[in-house]
Regions:
Chain A
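Amphipathic alpha-helical packing segments from all-alpha helical-bundle domains
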Residues: 108-134, 145-156, 160, 175-182
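Hydrophobic alpha-helical connector segments
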Residues: 66-94
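Secondary-structure edge/capping motif, primarily at the C-terminal ends of alpha-helices
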Residues: 65-68, 96-103, 131-132, 158-166
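Short, Lys/Arg-enriched anionic-surface-contact patches
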Residues: 1-4
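C-terminal peripheral helix-coil segments that are non-catalytic and often amphipathic
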Residues: 126, 157-204
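Amphipathic alpha-helical segments used for helix-helix packing
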Residues: 89-111, 125-129
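Short, basic, alpha-helical segments at the C-terminal edge of helix-turn-helix-like DNA-binding modules
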Residues: 55-61
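Helix-turn-helix
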Residues: 6, 10, 14-52
Length: 204, 204, 204, 204
DNA sequence: AATGAATGAGGGTTCATTCAT
DNA sequence: GATGAATGAACCCTCATTCAT
């Protein structure tokens, strides 16, 4: 694997582990066993690394976006898709968690970041559109977009705030997906479908 | 107003404006027109300021928490309450936005932070409990808690990610509250109540 | 003596000795026995030190400028005045020697530098004006200004290029002053005065 | 043209444009479209490039020096010769402008540099000797050498300090030559010759 | 001749924090 | 309560230079 790729991979791991602010360019180089000069030969600084990671994340989401029409055929497809989506987000979670810090430390990232956010919003809106095609949600388009935003925000927040820090990443992802599906539950039920495992409702 | 309070107020404003990472102890002192030594006389460092802000936020949420039983009497009470809640969150938004960066820069904040998060979770769960008391939601307690978590995450994310950066703070807050209500809409409707203004549903 | 003054003094000595490019902020701090942080507390960087030195030099020249009308009463006054002038230049010689390097490393100095150069030019022109008042030089004003420029350039160059590097600073200054007077010799002679010690002319 | 020559040419252009200190080995290689490794194959470093440029300049001045006896036949020959001399200096102006910075950054250049300076001094002295042969200057040899030094310094300074930065290079050269001739004017006049265009003298 | 990844020392700068006054 | 000079560690980055290919 080329040095450039190794830098990106290691950076992402370190950024996810300790936050982008806590990881210096030198610590990345040290973790890789390369000299700081070499790091700067491949990327002109931390900002360029982050730009590359943002682009990678954007690309991964773009691929998901393109596959939505094909993959979301029935109500059972939403949970796996949400999981794929959350998996991408989790893989690049540092980008979402440190969003605010990055905004001020690296104004140059603003455009990449807003492009990324726009794409997520599109995915969220398309998700509800597909759901509506399967069975009318009983919402105005405006309400549907609001619901899409809430869904997206809830998903983003599940990447940022770990409610069960003790559980491992995969379990957290599955729980996040379930929580998101609960938001959609009434609409899926209205479509005569309940994708979430049935439990006894209204226990005290 | 005492110097201690002025430090907290100014810090919060600066932290909200430019992020906690971008604001140094010196810049707080400069903004206040006091010497760095004086700042350190009142607070042993940036971490202590943040701890104090976390405590203030926690206190404000505690007050809201205690009033819920009294204030949430009918379905029309939920929107104002959500607004109050979001207003507190918005006032201390730097704490939520820089959560990740703070976690690593100041491990000493971890306990205060998890206490804060727990309280928000309690509020969210109590919110749905009250709703359930008004009219059964048709959810198991576990599903209800998941819904509560989604609601909370959506609220937290609306503090972290500005979807409409051009609008002013108050407008953003109202939109956030509406978005959250959309999440609850099916349950409120099931209770024979629709707190959100009626629009023509299912337009193409 | 205050730290600020000590920084300026030491910087000037080091800059003169080894050139502005060869002296780092750290080496100044080390030479003074202070920490780099303290250096940056007093000056935001090397550029601010240089700006302050340029201002000091400008001030010294301004003082000389103001005294010219009073001090240049007769032909015997020119040599001492030239020596004073050269002494100031020699004291700040790093500014003239590294002029080009500074121009590119610190564009912020451009304005201070051009102001300084303008003042030197004014002094040179006033010098010839006074000489002309003592005895007509037989030059058009335009020719007189050209002569003033040549005189100034010759003086500046004597600060930049050491023709006799083995001799000590004071001797070099005196020789420089003599060289400059030789340029003026024909005009002083025409005024019936020969301020330079008489030697036997036109030896083989 | 061989790579070696292209390196020298491009280096000289860049050094003249932005100063020797601001131009790194890498930037020269980039400007040439070659790899840094290739640059170091031809020259062991920036110092060797500068040594080569010093040698080129020295050679050009040597050629001028040898032609002086032949070319300086009459008083009208001095201006064109001065122009040729200044043109060489202007072509290699970075060497003179950054003299001080180079001295400390590259002590290895000291010998080449002092040889160069000595040659210029010889040329300046020979110039006055030829003038004296055309018509006695009325100066002792010592005074004549001092005048030669002043002339040389004035010429060097005109390469280092741009008094009229807005005018193009050729115009600056011509003005510099005129300024130098003004220094010689009294002696040329004394020889019954005025090489500078006559203007009305002693206007107020 | 030429490439380009890699090195490592060093420079400029920031900042949380201390302490004598 | 308050000042402000001082500290020192750490960070980001540049650059001359080397070397395997």
């Amino acid at each position: 694997m080329g040095t450039r790729e190794r830098i990106l991979d290691t950076s992402l791991v370190l950024f996810n582990q300790e936050g982008t602010a806590a990881i210096s360019a030198l610590s990345i180089a040290t973790a890789l066993g390369i000299s700081p000069g070499n790091l700067y030969y491949h990327f002109r600084g931390k900002e360029e690394i982050l730009t590359a990671l943002l682009a990678e994340c954007d690309l991964a989401l773009d691929r998901l976006h393109r596959r939505m029409d094909v993959e979301l055929k029935g109500p059972m497809d939403f949970e796996p898709f949400l999981l794929s989506l959350l998996r991408v987000g989790h893989h690049f979670r540092c980008l979402f968690r440190d969003q605010e810090a990055l905004r001020f430390a690296h104004p140059g990232l603003a455009r990449s970041w807003s492009r990324l956010l726009k794409r997520i919003r599109q995915i969220s809106q398309l998700l509800l559109k597909r759901l509506n095609q399967l069975s009318p949600l009983g919402l105005t388009p405006s309400q549907r977009d609001k619901l899409a935003d809430s869904l997206m925000l809830s998903a983003l927040a599940s990447l940022c705030f770990e409610l069960e820090p003790d559980k491992d990443g995969e379990t957290q992802l599955i729980q996040s997906a379930h929580s998101l599906l609960v938001l959609l539950r009434p609409y899926l039920e209205a479509a005569g479908l309940n994708p979430v495992s049935n439990e006894q409702a209204n226990a005290p």
